Structures are given as C-alpha cells and as structure tokens.
Amino acid sequence: MADAMDLAQLREQEDRERHISNARSRRHEVSAFICEECDAPIPEARRRAIPGVQCCVTCQEILELKSKHYNGGAL
C-alpha cells in the first residue's frame, strides 16, 4: 500500500510530465540551421528537441551565463 510520501512523489512526477508536455506542445517556432552567434551548424537532434532554437549549445550556455551574471545571479 502506498503511503503519503509515495502519493506525493507520484503527483509531483505527473505534474512535471504534464508541464513538460505542455511546454513542448506550445512551441511551433521554426528552428535555425545555423547558430546566430557563431555561424556553426545546429545539430538536427537539438533542433528537434528544442523547437525554435537559434543558438548552438556552446553559445546558448554563454548567453545563459551572461544573463545570469548581468541579472545579478550567482556564478
């Protein structure tokens, strides 16, 4: 028999999966084939996984780190 913690974890997992599904279905943007920052090709797997992607992984990481830094986030 499931206890309260098991039920809470199941509910949390279901919520997370629902949120991921909703986020993926909302995006109908066209992905770029070439990174807008460095002109490197963006792999097909990345374009399929993240609809609307405009940057390669490396450039996206740099943009996120800069954003975190400029917005006062800790590095």
UniProtKB/Swiss-Prot annotation:
Biological processes annotated in GO: positive regulation of secondary metabolite biosynthetic process
InterPro entries in the cross-refs: Znf_C4-type_bac, Znf_C4_TraR, Znf_DskA_TraR, Znf_DskA_TraR_CS
Annotated region described as Disordered, given as residue ranges: 1-23
GO MF entries: zinc ion binding
Protein keywords: Metal-binding, Zinc, Zinc-finger
Biased composition regions of type Basic and acidic residues, renumbered to the chain: 9-20
Protein name (Swiss-Prot/TrEMBL): Uncharacterized 8.5 kDa protein in gpA 5'region
Taxonomic source organism: Escherichia phage 186
Lineage, opening ranks: Viruses, Duplodnaviria, Heunggongvirae, Uroviricota, Caudoviricetes
Gene this protein is translated from: CP80
